[in-house]
Amino acid sequence: MIHDIDLVLELAKAPVVRLAAAGGRSADGPIDYVNATLGFENGVVASLTASKMSHRKIRSLSAHCRSSLVETDFLNHTLHIHRRAHEWYSADHGELLYRNDGFIEEVSTTSIEPLYAELEHFLQCVRGRETPAVDGLQASRALKLADLIEQAVEHPDSGAPLLAPI
């Protein structure tokens, strides 16, 4: 979930001011599944889910925007933008032929394996050829939020609000 947290923090470009999380485990061990809802200062709301219980691999992101829905499938390397359109097409004499209620754009993506790309980037940073894509402040912020999500799952009755923006 740490990569999802980092991605959402980067996309939202605002501090997290609200947090609600739930999850659990199947036995006496680490947490098996988590669902966290993050509220950002700028009004963005993000919902993250991570599960070790599912037999299906799911790595996706949906972003609800003012005039579109963006859906990304990281495993299949697809990105679709759903846009609303309210255009009416009619014949010369006013008879309705059809209505375009929306359209879907398919954005071209690369099929680079994310783990390979991450390790390659790490090696380039160690060799001094690149600077880290995620700096220390970004990583610290993501880790702090991951820790708060874990605390909320471990102690669901605490009801402790997020005291300071992250």
Positions of predicted regions on the chain:
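Rossmann-like dinucleotide-binding domain that binds NAD(P)(H)
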Residues: 1-56, 60-64, 74-76
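A general structural signal for well-ordered alpha-helical segments in protein cores
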Residues: 4-8, 116-120, 146
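C-terminal helix-rich "cap/oligomerization" subdomain common to oxidoreductases
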Residues: 41, 121-166
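Short polybasic amphipathic segments
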Residues: 61-63, 77-90, 95-98
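Short, solvent-exposed cationic patches
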Residues: 67-76, 165
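Active-site loop of classical SDR/Rossmann-like NAD(P)-dependent oxidoreductases
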Residues: 106-120, 134
